[in-house]
């Protein structure tokens, strides 16, 4: 079980930051967890969950000073159990994802539950043959072998998980800059159209719609 650190800053606020900062390469050490694709194995509008959970996984790695095996958290758990409050493959909210994890009490490691890019309201054909409700074996399970070989799965009651000490909102690029530099990646919603031509620096497109 891993409990995340407080959202509050661990160092004094500074107005001076390096010209660039990449948690993926700090003195040749990668403090980030693996890259993910929300649309594998099929389309799923779960960018909000990927952003929230990836930032949490990264912060755990930063808190552990990149020691030991990476702890990746189960995004599928939020799609199974947070569909009513946080979102689904049809969209959701990253802040609501943190709220759900906090209210539920924990989030399992992804070794409990592989990402399937499905939720119970998915229209993709591949998602129609399985139950994605929030039942014990859709939180953490172990299987004897592959289903096409006749394998059976059962739930695990005591499973590895992470918790959230607290969470909150950060607004304004200076506060975001400070939070990222001090504590690690953050999750945020943006209009993705502007990213198509993004080359670097602060993304500032005042004429673009702010609707997300």
Go through the PLM ranges and name each one.
Residues 1-212:
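Catalytic-core signature of thiol
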């Amino acid at each position: 079980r891993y409990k995340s650190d407080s959202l509050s800053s661990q160092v004094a606020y500074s107005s001076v930051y390096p010209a660039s900062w990449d948690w993926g390469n700090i003195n040749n050490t990668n403090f980030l967890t693996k890259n993910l694709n929300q649309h594998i194995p099929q389309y799923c509008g779960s960018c909000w969950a990927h952003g929230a959970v990836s930032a949490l996984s990264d912060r755990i790695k930063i808190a552990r000073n990149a020691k030991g095996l990476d702890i990746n958290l189960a995004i599928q758990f939020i799609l199974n159990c947070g569909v009513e409050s946080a979102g689904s493959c049809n969209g959701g909210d990253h802040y609501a994802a943190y709220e759900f994890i906090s209210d539920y009490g924990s989030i399992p490691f992804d070794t409990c539950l592989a990402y399937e890019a499905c939720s119970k309201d998915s229209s993709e054909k591949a998602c129609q043959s399985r139950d994605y409700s929030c039942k014990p074996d859709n939180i953490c399970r172990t299987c004897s072998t592959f289903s096409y070989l006749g394998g059976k799965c059962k739930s695990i009651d005591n499973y590895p998980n992470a918790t959230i000490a607290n969470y909150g909102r950060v607004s304004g690029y200076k506060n975001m800059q400070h939070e990222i530099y001090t504590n690690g990646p953050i999750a945020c919603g943006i209009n993705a159209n502007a990213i198509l031509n993004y080359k670097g620096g602060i993304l500032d497109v005042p004429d673009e719609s702010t609707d997300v």
